[in-house]
């Protein structure tokens, strides 16, 4: 049975660790960003320079509850851009400080997912016991793409465009097994397939705190909104990369883990339960 990688969500309406406990036997890992850290989604507890650091204790408590269940913790450093700090000692020290803090609080991550080869390098150098996973944001979809960074990563969350290409997934999985690597796929991405605006959007998310301080133009940065205004394009929804819950078992032997996007979903428990 394929197990799930699910994204932590803080919400005043529910306790995420309780949702995890309800489906613990089906969950391999819980992925999460640290507060005040850029990732592939908005920062936890932060907006326009204000951070609710009280959430730190809530997150630590939730992570401890999850770790006791025997579920792996997957720390995210998957922002699409780290600006001028991209390969700096400052960024290295920030990464180390978060991992060391989590270790001191008995929730050391088992896995680190990143879109940055530089972050993968410094984590592997200092914490060789931590699994390094290439973010789906790296859009790796070929054996060659994995080979380029195989010295840095132990596993790969492959591009969502691979999801309905069974032969491609089999090829990726065969190479991974031969090279002691693992494959994860993202089953329910909210993005359109082959979105030409994704890199632009991901860069905006990485810099959203800075962008919020600017006098911005009237522009919708989500290409799908304009595209789907035209009804003739509705068929693209069916052509996307999302995988139906009833089809997950068909991917047994082609991937090792199925990632679910639950960090921004209103009903994460429903997604996991499905």
Where are these regions (language model features)?
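Active-site pocket-lining/capping segments in soluble small-molecule metabolic enzymes
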Residues: 1-144, 153, 157-274
């Amino acid at each position: 049975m394929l197990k799930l990688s699910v994204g932590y969500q803080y919400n005043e309406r529910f306790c995420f660790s309780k949702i995890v406990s309800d489906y613990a036997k089906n969950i391999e890992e819980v992925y999460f960003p640290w507060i005040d850290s850029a990732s592939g989604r908005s920062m936890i507890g932060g907006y326009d320079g204000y951070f609710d650091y009280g959430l730190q204790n809530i997150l630590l408590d939730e992570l401890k509850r999850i770790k006791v269940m025997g579920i792996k913790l997957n720390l995210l450093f998957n922002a699409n851009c780290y600006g001028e700090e991209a390969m700096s000692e400052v960024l290295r020290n920030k990464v180390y400080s978060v991992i060391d803090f989590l270790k001191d609080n008995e929730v050391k991550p088992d896995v680190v997912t990143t879109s940055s080869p530089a972050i993968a390098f410094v984590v592997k150098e200092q914490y060789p016991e931590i699994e390094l996973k290439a973010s789906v944001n790296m859009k790796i979809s070929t054996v060659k793409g994995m080979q380029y960074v195989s010295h840095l990563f132990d596993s790969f969350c492959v591009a969502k465009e691979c999801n309905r290409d069974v032969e491609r997934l089999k090829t990726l999985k065969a190479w991974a097994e031969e090279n002691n690597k693992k494959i994860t796929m993202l089953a329910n991405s909210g993005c359109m397939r082959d979105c030409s605006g994704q890199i632009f959007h991901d860069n905006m998310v990485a810099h959203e705190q800075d962008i919020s301080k600017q006098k911005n133009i009237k522009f919708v940065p989500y290409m799908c909104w304009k595209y789907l205004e035209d009804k003739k394009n509705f068929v693209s929804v069916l052509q996307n990369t999302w995988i139906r819950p009833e089809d997950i078992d068909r991917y047994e032997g082609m991937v090792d883990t199925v990632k679910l996007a639950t960090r921004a979903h209103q009903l994460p428990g429903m997604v996991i339960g499905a």
